[in-house]
A protein has these predicted regions:
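Positively charged n-region of N-terminal signal peptides that target proteins for export
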Residues: 1-11
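C-terminal motif of bacterial Sec signal peptides marking the signal peptidase cleavage site
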Residues: 15-19
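Bacterial signal peptide processing site
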Residues: 21-24
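Post-signal peptide N-terminal segment of mature Sec-exported envelope proteins
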Residues: 28-46
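Short, compositionally biased low-complexity segments enriched in polar/charged residues
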Residues: 47-78, 90-95, 121-122
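A short, solvent-exposed beta-edge/loop patch
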Residues: 73-74, 116-153
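Second-shell loop/turn segments in exported
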Residues: 80-88, 132-137
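Short Gly/Thr-rich strand-loop-strand
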Residues: 89-129
Length: 153
């Protein structure tokens, strides 16, 4: 009886561990994904790295511990890459909200000063996966989505 019970419990443990296994989403490496997007996606303007201090200033409502990497257009376009890696999936939801607010602010500014940039911003990619989130403002959304999928799953 004990052997049967042990076997059943072992089987349940294995099933439980399998259920908690990979859901397809990978943990995000913020700098690696931001670099891959910058080098692999077509942008109209040249993009320059944004410091973590600048990103922290731009993104309100972020969790306590996170790593962010980003690039912004040097010219007059709204092109931008922001990748945020956080401690867990709950923090990723906070990051998504912060990126949504940031995108809304970009749209508000564009509507006043650069209305021709609104279609680009309306087509921006905002994705949450694994332990982070990605915002990519580009016209080359097919390539960007492909790269994001490769890194996030």
């Amino acid at each position: 009886m004990k052997k049967i019970l042990s076997a059943v419990l072992a089987a349940l443990l294995i099933l439980t561990l399998c259920a908690c296994g990979s859901s397809g989403a990978k943990d995000i490496d913020a700098q690696a994904l931001a670099d891959a997007l910058k080098s692999g996606v077509a942008f109209e303007d040249t993009l320059s790295a944004v410091s973590s201090d600048e990103l922290a200033f731009s993104l309100s409502g972020m969790p306590e511990n996170y790593i962010a990497a980003g690039y912004r257009a040097d010219g007059t376009t709204s092109e931008e890459i922001v990748v945020v890696q956080c401690g867990n999936k709950d923090d990723a939801a906070m990051v998504k909200a912060a990126l949504e607010t940031h995108l809304a602010e970009l749209k508000d500014q564009a509507s006043k000063y650069q209305p021709e940039q609104l279609p680009l911003l309306d087509g921006a990619i905002l994705t949450v996966g694994g332990n982070g989130a990605v915002l990519c403002v580009t016209a080359d959304t097919d390539t960007a989505n492909s790269i994001i999928k490769e890194y996030v799953g």
